[in-house]
Each structure stands twice: as structure tokens, then as C-alpha cells.
Amino acid sequence: MFAKEYKIKAVPASRPKVPRYGHPYYPKRYTEFRKRWLEITKPDWPAIQAEMENTEEYEFSFEFWCAKHAKSDLDNVAKALEDELVKAGVILDDNLIVVTKARKHFNAGYDAIKIFIRRIK
């Protein structure tokens, strides 16, 4: 099982904005979170990949703590975390996730995300 806590503020996945003229783009807040999430998790990629090696099913669970009351949906935060690890090639395919557990803590006084990845089969 892989488990680690990261000191970063959780940002939910957002839909791309589509201007009348030009190309679709993601909001700056979400784009910056995606970059930062990959930066801080990069040293742990070998451990995550080792946990997922030769597996058909796994659990991806997380908890996040908010300094204030967050309005973000749990499923959108999970999507943001999973999608970036898939894009980086750390997680081969997020359709192998068969169990997801999520929990958020309000008014904790600090921002953090803790992820758990466990091989099932």
C-alpha cells in the first residue's frame, strides 16, 4: 500500500472554458494546481508504480483538509488527482480503479491532501 500526505490545497477538476473566438483553456487556478501536483508527487512516482505493477484492480482513496470551508465536490477533486497521474504515465489507466474512498475535513487550519493507493488484484 502506498500512502502519503502532501501540503497542497486541493483544487477540483474544472471544465475547459470556451471563448467565443480562440481555443478552449482551463482556468489558471486549476492549471497551476495540476503543475504543482505533478511536481510534488514526482519523487514518489516509482513507489506508486511499484504498487500498481501487474495489477488488474486497485483502490485509490484520498482525504483532504481545507483551511476554510471548501465548496468543492469530492468527485471533482478525485478526478483532478487521478487525471494528472494518468497523464504523467504514473497510473496506467484509471479505469482499473474499483474502489474509491474520499473524505474532506473543513476548517482544519491548513491545506493538505493524503492519497492511498492499494493493490486489490
Regions found by a protein language model. Give the residues of each.
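Acidic, proline/glycine-enriched N-terminal capping motif
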Residues: 1-121
